[in-house]
C-alpha cells in the first residue's frame, strides 16, 4: 500500500512538473511572438517585391523558409540594401562596397530584424557573419536610445579562435562607426587583457572554452544577454563543446533573448540543441533540404586524382606550376596537409622550389599564425600550407584553388577544407590527391561528389562506394551501438 501511494505521489509530481514546463514554454512562445510582432510594426519593406520576384529569388538560390510560429506575419526576403530598416546611416556605410545581399542575408534579415529566433543552414562563405551581425548592431543601437545598454548585451560563440577573430574583425568595421565596443575572447593568450576588454564590450565574440573559464571566475556576467549567436553549431558539437555551450547559456534570460544558430549540417544533436534553447525558430535553408550529411558547395569544381603516396609531393609541385603561371602567378592557393610534420616538410619543399609560401599549423603561436594569414591575405605569400586548424571558418578572399595533399580523417573535414574557395558567390576549384591509404573514406567522398554533381573518377570507384561507420570519439573504430532492449544471453558452464 505504501509503495502504491509513493508511486501515485511520484506520478502526480511528474505531471505537475510537465505541466509547469509546458506552461513556461507556451509563455515563452507568446512572449517571442509578441516581441516579433512589436518589431514587425517597426520593420516595413519600402518596396515590397512582387510574388514573381520573390518566387524567382527563392528558386534561383534554392531557399527554403520554414516558420513554426502560428499566426506570424509573413515576411519577404530583403533583396536590396535600400530595403533595410531605418537606423543611423553610419551603420550601413560599409555596405556601399557591396552590390546586394547574399542569399542567406536576404532570407534571414527580415526575421532577425523582427526579433525572431532563426536557424540558418548554409555553406561556409555565404555571408552569414554579416547576416547575424547587422541585426545585432541595429538591436544595440535601438537599446542605446532607451538608455545605457548592459554590457555585454550580445554574445557570439564560434568553434575556433581563427573564426572568432574573423567574426570580430568583420563586425568591428561596422561597430566602430556607431561607437559599439566588441571584445574577442579565445584561449592561448593571457586572460588579463580579455578581462579588461569585457568591462566595456557590448558584444562578445568568443570560443566556448575560454568564455566558460571567464564566466566561472566571475570576469563576465551573462545574465542580461539579449542576443545570442551560435555560429557553426555543428562544428562546435563535433569538437565536444556541447556541455560548455549549455553552461554558458544557462544564466541568460529566456523570454527576452533572441537566439540565432548557423550550421552547415542538420544532424540530430544540432536539432536537440536548437529545441532546448530556441523558441519557435524560423528555419532558413540555402541549397536544398537540410541534411545530416556534409554537402560541398556546388560552385566548387572538385577534382580527385588517385596517386601513389610517394608521388604526392611531386604532383603538388606540378599543379602549383600549372596554376601559378602567367597572369595567374599571383593567384592564392591553399594547400592542406594532415599532420604538422607533413605541413612543415611541404612548406620547406615549396620554399626551396621558389614559391612564395607561408604556413599555419598547430605548433605555431598565435602571432605566427596571424603573420602567416596576413601575408597570404595581402598577397605577399601566394601559397599557404595548412593543417585542419585553418580549415574551418577562415575568410580569406579570392582563394582560387585548394589542394589536398593528404585526405583528412573525415569527409566533413574535406568539405570544410574545400569550402575555403568558392566563397561569397564566386566559383571555386579544389584538387584532392587520393591514395590507397585513404580508401576507407572513398565511399563518403563519392557521395559528396555525387551530391554536388561532380565527376567521380573510375580509379576512385575501384576503392568501393561503401560508407564506413563513423568512429566514436572515445572508442574509435571498435565502437558499436548496443541495443539495450535486447535480452541478455545466459552463459551456463558445465560442472
From Swiss-Prot:
Q: Where is the composition biased (Basic residues)?
A: 15-27
Q: Which residues form the signal peptide?
A: none
Predominant location category: nucleus
> Where is the Helicase C-terminal domain positioned along the sequence?
315-464
* A GO cellular component annotation in the UniProt record: preribosome, large subunit precursor
Identify one Pfam family in the record: DEAD
Q: Name one GO biological process term.
A: endonucleolytic cleavage in ITS1 upstream of 5.8S rRNA from tricistronic rRNA transcript (SSU-rRNA, 5.8S rRNA, LSU-rRNA)
Basic and acidic residues: bias regions? 1-14
User: What is the residue range of the motif DEAD box?
Assistant: 231-234
MF annotations from Gene Ontology: ATP binding; ATP hydrolysis activity; RNA binding; RNA helicase activity
Q: Where in the cell is it found?
A: Nucleus, Nucleolus
Enzyme class, top EC level, equals hydrolase
**Highest taxon of source:** Eukaryota
Catalytic activities: ATP + H2O = ADP + phosphate + H(+)
* Motif extent (Q motif): 97-105
Residues that coordinate or bind ATP: 122-129
Which family is this protein grouped under?
Belongs to the DEAD box helicase family. DDX5/DBP2 subfamily.
List the PANTHER family. Answer: ATP-DEPENDENT RNA HELICASE DBP3
What is the protein name for this chain? ATP-dependent RNA helicase dbp3
Q: Which gene encodes it?
A: dbp3
Amino acid at each position: 500500500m505504501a509503495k502504491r501511494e509513493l508511486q501515485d505521489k511520484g506520478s502526480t509530481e511528474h505531471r505537475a512538473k510537465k505541466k509547469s514546463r509546458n506552461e513556461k514554454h507556451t509563455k515563452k512562445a507568446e512572449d517571442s511572438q509578441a516581441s516579433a510582432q512589436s518589431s514587425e510594426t517597426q520593420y516595413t519593406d519600402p518596396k515590397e517585391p512582387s510574388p514573381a520576384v520573390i518566387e524567382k529569388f527563392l528558386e534561383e538560390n534554392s531557399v527554403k523558409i520554414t516558420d513554426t510560429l502560428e499566426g506570424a506575419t509573413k515576411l519577404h526576403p530583403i533583396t536590396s540594401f535600400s530595403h533595410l530598416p531605418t537606423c543611423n546611416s553610419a551603420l550601413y556605410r560599409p555596405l556601399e562596397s557591396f552590390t546586394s545581399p547574399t542569399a542567406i542575408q536576404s532570407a534571414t534579415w527580415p526575421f532577425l530584424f523582427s526579433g525572431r529566433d532563426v536557424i540558418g543552414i548554409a555553406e561556409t562563405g555565404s555571408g552569414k557573419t554579416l547576416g547575424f551581425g547587422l541585426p545585432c548592431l541595429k538591436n544595440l543601437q535601438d537599446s542605446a536610445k532607451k538608455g545605457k545598454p548592459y554590457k555585454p548585451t550580445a554574445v557570439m560563440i564560434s568553434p575556433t579562435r581563427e573564426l572568432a577573430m574573423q567574426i570580430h574583425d568583420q563586425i568591428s568595421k561596422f561597430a566602430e562607426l556607431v561607437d559599439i565596443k566588441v571584445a574577442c575572447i579565445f584561449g592561448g593568450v593571457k586572460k588579463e587583457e580579455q578581462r579588461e576588454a569585457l568591462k566595456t564590450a557590448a558584444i562578445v565574440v568568443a570560443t566556448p572554452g575560454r568564455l566558460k573559464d571567464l564566466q566561472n571566475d566571475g570576469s563576465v556576467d551573462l545574465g542580461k544577454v539579449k542576443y545570442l549567436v551560435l555560429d557553426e553549431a555543428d562544428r562546435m558539437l563535433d569538437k565536444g563543446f556541447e556541455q560548455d555551450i549549455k553552461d554558458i547559456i544557462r544564466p541568460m534570460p529566456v523570454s527576452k533573448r533572441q537566439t540565432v544558430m548557423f550550421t552547415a549540417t542538420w544532424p540530430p544533436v544540432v536539432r536537440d540543441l536548437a529545441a532546448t534553447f530556441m523558441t519557435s525558430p524560423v528555419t532558413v535553408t540555402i541549397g536544398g533540404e537540410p541534411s545530416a550529411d556534409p554537402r560541398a558547395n556546388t560552385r566548387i569544381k572538385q577534382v580527385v586524382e588517385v596517386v601513389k603516396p610517394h608521388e604526392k609531393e611531386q604532383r603538388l609541385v606540378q599543379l602549383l606550376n600549372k596554376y601559378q603561371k602567367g597572369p595567374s602567378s599571383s593567384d592564392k592557393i591553399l594547400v592542406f596537409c594532415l599532420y604538422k610534420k607533413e605541413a612543415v616538410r611541404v612548406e620547406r619543399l615549396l620554399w626551396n622550389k621558389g614559391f612564395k609560401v607561408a604556413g599555419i599549423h598547430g605548433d605555431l603561436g598565435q602571432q605566427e599564425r596571424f603573420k602567416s594569414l596576413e601575408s597570404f591575405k595581402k598577397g605577399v605569400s601566394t601559397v599557404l600550407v595548412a593543417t585542419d586548424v585553418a580549415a574551418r571558418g577562415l575568410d580569406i578572399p579570392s582563394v582560387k584553388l585548394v589542394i589536398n595533399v593528404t585526405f583528412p580523417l573525415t569527409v566533413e573535414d574535406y568539405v570544410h577544407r574545400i569550402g575555403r574557395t568558392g566563397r561569397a558567390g564566386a566559383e571555386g576549384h579544389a584538387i584532392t590527391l587520393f591514395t590507397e591509404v585513404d580508401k576507407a573514406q572513398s565511399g563518403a567522398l563519392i557521395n559528396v561528389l555525387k551530391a554536388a554533381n561532380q565527376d567521380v573518377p573510375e580509379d576512385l570507384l575501384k576503392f568501393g562506394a561503401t560508407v564506413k561507420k563513423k568512429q566514436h570519439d572515445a572508442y574509435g573504430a571498435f565502437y558499436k551501438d548496443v541495443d539495450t532492449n535486447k535480452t541478455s544471453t545466459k552463459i551456463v558452464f558445465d560442472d
